Amino acid sequence: MNIGAIIAATVLVAAVGLFIGVFLGVAGKKFAVEVDEKEVAVREALPGNNCGGCGYPGCDGLAAAIAKGEAPVNGCPVGGEPVGKVIAAIMGQEVVETARQVAYVKCAGTCEKTKDNYEYTGVEDCEMMAFIPGGGAKSCTYGCLGFGSCVKACPFGAIDVVNGVAVVDKEACKACGKCVAKCPKHLIELVPYEQTTFVQCSSHAKGKAVTSACEVGCIGCKKCEKACPNGAITVDNFCAHIDYSKCTNCGACKEVCPRHIIQ
């Protein structure tokens, strides 16, 4: 191969490279997606757990919504107040303080308090177990199945199954709501962090059925409802419920509960 051919090939390759470079540069400018600097800053301030507890598809979705003014600056339940304040500063807003929430499991039917109707040896998954006739092996068809689907769903390790019932570590809980969505028995709810009074039962069975299934289940006697000075507790469908916005944690309901299910 002579020197002329080598030079020609080199020039051709250089020309092709230059053309591609110019083409990509022009295309990059033409099709460039504008980046919202505030959105980027908000995204960097978020913890990055992508838990979905905010109601958006991950931290990117929440950051975009906050930047557009479609979500509150304190919309991240994981970051809480500290992250909310940082994002508020980025957006030039004042953060509206909200009460911290944590998950709570409304069941006290431990292995000692309830019994199994039969020995279950299948897949240990609450959602699958809930489809079995009778709603599971436990004598109470409303209670915690104890297989830990909520434990697996929690990205923060805030839930454990203790003696057959799921228990939440309120200090580790970030109120992302994944356990709430995962429980097939709908036993888990988000409650105020400062709340200290709870009805540890979700059964809607009548009194006799409850006493035969669980040693501590609510029998719907309404003694707690009558004792509450604030009208914060009501019995609906044979089970007591607390309105946390009215409850002062006075303990009057605890004192009169014959089943000691209010703690």
Residue ranges and their predicted role:
Residues 2-227, 231, 254-256, 260-263:
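Ferredoxin-type iron-sulfur electron-transfer modules and their immediate structural context
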Residues 223, 233-235, 239-241:
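Strongly charged, low-complexity linkers/loops
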